């Protein structure tokens, strides 16, 4: 049994070698010749999986180690009788922590408290729900917009997008990309929406590039609209609008979900799905894969305020480390993918062990996802 895996999927060689012969290949572009005798293909979001790639090939199963699936033609796979699995929620924690890192940086730079801001969350799936929970743990007001969930009658106080635009100081997008249909998200943030944002608002896109109309956004910024922008995703990736990058406050190369934990979850989820597909079901404990953290233990005295939270968050991950490299190489062919391929190891907040002498600080840090314990001062 021959299994092709994206060369940038961590732990893929070790895990899938338990099931068959593993060949690691680049994800963009996939070497088509390798597909001629392969039984399974494991990809990431950079690989377009469709009829033109797989027609006439012996592939029986496709796995994507990503939460999003808009790069996969699921309807064609089903029609062709090819098994499929994604990894929903695998990188949700990472994306939430990316958003926090960005917001805390902007709050420090511009001198505002997040408690004084209302956050509008567009898309309340694995990422949006976790983001809502962490923001509300901090006492920050959130507004939710998710028409598909609202129409299904899912639990939640869902509002219209217009209401979020009117009332939110921060608008952050966490939707799939739907190019048509009743829940179309292509250019959901169009010129009209962008121009309608509150003065001084913050716009964040960490889902799919085309959810925000990049051309319209650049037009508004060029005209001097008072708006802070965080973009991790771009229309036309791996190409991007260099002029837009110059205008945004934070720009990164589609790495919001790139924690070691998130990548490992993605790989293990598709591994487990494929092992079940072939009748040799196996399960993997995530902590058996992850290396020891680089941190020892941190001692925190007193309550948790915003400056202290910012220091803890940025100790684990400061978004500026990914903004600067992109600006240096933007516009150079191949460099966007190279930044992603050679991405520095990044951990999640759970990797930081915090000893608190304040019980409320320890409790709050645990709610936020840190590994915190309370030890009263002696």
Swiss-Prot record:
Keywords: Cytoplasm, NAD, Oxidoreductase, Pyridoxine biosynthesis. GO terms for biological process: 'de novo' pyridoxal 5'-phosphate biosynthetic process; pyridoxine biosynthetic process. NAD(+) binds at residues 146, 175, 232, 257. It holds the Pfam family 2-Hacid_dh_C. GO terms for molecular function: 4-phosphoerythronate dehydrogenase activity; NAD binding; protein dimerization activity. GO terms for cellular component: cytosol. PROSITE patterns: D_2_HYDROXYACID_DH_1, D_2_HYDROXYACID_DH_3. It catalyses: 4-phospho-D-erythronate + NAD(+) = (R)-3-hydroxy-2-oxo-4-phosphooxybutanoate + NADH + H(+). This is Erythronate-4-phosphate dehydrogenase. It comes from Escherichia coli O127:H6 (strain E2348/69 / EPEC). The gene is pdxB.
């Amino acid at each position: 049994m021959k299994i092709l895996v994206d060369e940038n999927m961590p732990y893929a060689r070790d895990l899938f070698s338990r099931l068959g012969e593993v060949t690691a290949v680049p994800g963009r572009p996939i070497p088509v010749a390798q597909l001629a005798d392969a039984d399974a293909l494991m990809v990431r979001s950079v690989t377009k999986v469709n009829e033109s790639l797989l027609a006439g090939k012996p592939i029986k199963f496709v796995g994507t180690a990503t939460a999003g699936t808009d790069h996969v033609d699921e309807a064609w796979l089903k029609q062709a009788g090819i098994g499929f699995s994604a990894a929903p929620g695998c990188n949700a924690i990472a994306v939430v922590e990316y958003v926090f890192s960005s917001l805390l940086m902007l709050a420090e730079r511009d001198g505002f408290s997040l408690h004084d801001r209302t956050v509008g969350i567009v898309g309340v799936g694995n990422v949006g729900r976790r983001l809502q929970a962490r923001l509300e743990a901090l006492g920050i007001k959130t507004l939710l917009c998710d028409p598909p969930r609202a129409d299904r009658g899912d639990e939640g106080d869902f509002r219209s997008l217009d209401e979020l635009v009117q009332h939110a100081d921060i608008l952050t997008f966490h939707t799939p990309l739907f190019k048509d249909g009743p829940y179309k998200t292509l250019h959901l943030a169009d010129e009209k929406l962008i121009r309608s944002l509150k003065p001084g608002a913050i716009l964040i896109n960490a889902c799919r590039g085309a959810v925000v109309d990049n051309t319209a956004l650049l037009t508004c910024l060029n005209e001097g609209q008072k708006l802070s922008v965080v973009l991790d995703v771009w229309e036309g990736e791996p190409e991007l609008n260099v002029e837009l990058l110059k205008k945004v406050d934070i720009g990164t190369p589609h790495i919001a979900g790139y924690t070691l934990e998130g990548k490992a979850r993605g790989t293990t989820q598709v591994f487990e799905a494929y092992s079940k597909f072939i009748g040799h079901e196996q399960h993997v404990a995530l902590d058996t894969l992850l290396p020891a953290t680089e941190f020892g233990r941190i001692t925190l005295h007193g309550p948790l305020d915003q400056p202290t939270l910012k220091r803890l968050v940025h100790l684990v991950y400061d978004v500026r480390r990914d903004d600067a490299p992109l600006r240096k190489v933007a516009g150079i062919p191949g460099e966007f993918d190279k930044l992603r391929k050679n991405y520095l190891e990044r951990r999640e907040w759970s990797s930081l062990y915090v000893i608190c002498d304040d019980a409320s600080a320890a409790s709050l840090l645990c709610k936020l996802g840190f590994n915190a314990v309370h030890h009263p001062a002696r």
